[in-house]
Amino acid sequence: ALRLILLEKLERFREEYPHVRLRLFNHSTPQAVQALKNYAVDFAIVTTPISIRKPLQKKSLLNYQEILVCGSKYKDLASSPVSIHELQDLPFVGLAEGTSTREMYMNYFMENHVSFQPDIEAATTDQVLPMIVHNLGIGFYPEPLAQEVIDDGKVFALQLKEPLPQREVCLVTNSSTTMSTAVKKAIEFIV
């Protein structure tokens, strides 16, 4: 979420309000939602899938697609569409358990009757791509962020026969809290 949407908006906010202090946390979606429920954060920017109940509210900020990418070791797989079944014996790089992304891919693989157990588990999405570039496995990555390294020939996009779920970046707020003026202004810049 940070690199997909938030950095540009925070840059503009900082130019307009240079004296407002910001504190960012790097939580998984479930951790961010829990922090919001516990009043530990003012709002959360998270990726779907997400499960929330009132008093939490979500607003979609950006739709995006993830793609399956590989390093040079597996680039021959990028020459034609492949089924997820054909890839089950390859090493996968994925996010650790306890993330909504991991849960989403567990469900995706289960729906396609394939087991999913990443060989390497990363704590954050930003850790996934360097491991793929260095041929430690194949993995899913947000297409807008992968495009530059695809264009540079560092990774290769695999075309899957089974469509991947659409993802969203969402703003989540807690309607049971009173927001400060600074928080309201920050949200205005984000949405």
Model-assigned labels for residue ranges:
Residues 8-12, 29-66, 70, 133, ...:
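Short beta-strand-centered segments that line the small-molecule binding cleft or hinge
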Residues 76-77, 91-112, 179-183, 187:
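Secondary-structure junction motif
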Residues 1-17, 21-25, 30-33:
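N-terminal winged-helix
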Residues 19-23, 115-119, 168-170:
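Residues at or immediately flanking beta-strands
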Residues 55-92:
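Flexible hinge/capping segments at coil-to-helix
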Residues 28-41, 47, 100-158:
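Hydrophobic hinge/microswitch elements
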Residues 5, 156-191:
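A late-sequence structural motif
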Residues 2, 74-75, 128, 146:
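A generic structural signal for short hydrophobic patches within well-formed alpha-helices
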